């Protein structure tokens, strides 16, 4: 459960990096595909090279979902309901992949904004990303 302090930390971080979120999410995907090659199976038709148009386009979608979740941090489940349905019924992404993506996102944030990613903010962002992953896999059952 995200505390009010966690919510404030997440919103503050997203406010500071918002203009780069799409770029960071594309970098996150490229990092995930390189570090965890099994995640590539969901994108057989993509050019998965870092910086490819398809990775950038999907990074934009991930950024949009994260921004939507952050903007509706008090009700992430409603904000991402349609995306949750898509992942359950059509995409059938292995739930562990959301954890891998979250880890890679934390790494990218630490690379680009080490001074912003204090231990408190890191913990809050990790909890937020776990909440997003939980929402996206909640309908799998």
From Swiss-Prot:
CDD domains hit by this protein: Hb-alpha-like (cd08927)
Expression (tissue specificity): Red blood cells.
Cellular component aspect of the GO annotation: blood microparticle; haptoglobin-hemoglobin complex; hemoglobin complex
BP GO terms, sorted: hydrogen peroxide catabolic process
Gene Ontology molecular functions: haptoglobin binding; heme binding; iron ion binding; organic acid binding; oxygen binding; oxygen carrier activity; peroxidase activity
PROSITE patterns according to UniProt: GLOBIN
Residues reported to bind O2: 58
Globin domain residues: 1-141
InterPro entries named in the record: Globin (IPR000971), Globin-like_sf (IPR009050), Globin/Proto (IPR012292), Hemoglobin_a-typ (IPR002338), Hemoglobin_oxygen_transport (IPR050056), Hemoglobin_pi (IPR002339)
Keywords (A to Z) from UniProt: Heme, Iron, Metal-binding, Oxygen transport, Transport
Binding-site list for heme b: 87
Alphabetical list of PANTHER family matching this protein: HEMOGLOBIN FAMILY MEMBER, HEMOGLOBIN SUBUNIT ALPHA
Similarity comment text for this entry: Belongs to the globin family.
Quaternary state and interactors: Heterotetramer of two alpha chains and two beta chains.
Protein task: Involved in oxygen transport from the lung to the various peripheral tissues.
Protein name per UniProt: Hemoglobin subunit alpha-A
Organism: Phoenicopterus ruber (American flamingo)
């Amino acid at each position: 459960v995200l505390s009010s302090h966690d919510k404030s930390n997440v919103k503050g971080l997203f406010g500071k990096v918002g203009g780069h979120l799409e770029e960071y999410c594309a970098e996150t995907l490229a990092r995930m595909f390189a570090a965890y090659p099994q995640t590539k199976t969901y994108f057989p038709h993509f050019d998965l090279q870092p910086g490819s148009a398809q990775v950038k386009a999907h990074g934009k979608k991930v950024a949009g979902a994260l921004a939507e979740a952050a903007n509706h941090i008090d009700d992430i489940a409603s904000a991402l309901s349609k995306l949750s349905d898509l992942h359950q019924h059509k995409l059938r992404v292995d739930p562990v992949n959301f954890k891998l993506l979250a880890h890679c996102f934390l790494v990218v944030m630490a690379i680009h904004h080490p001074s912003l990613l204090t231990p408190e903010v890191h913990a809050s962002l990790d909890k937020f990303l776990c909440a997003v992953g939980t929402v996206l896999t909640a309908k799998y059952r």
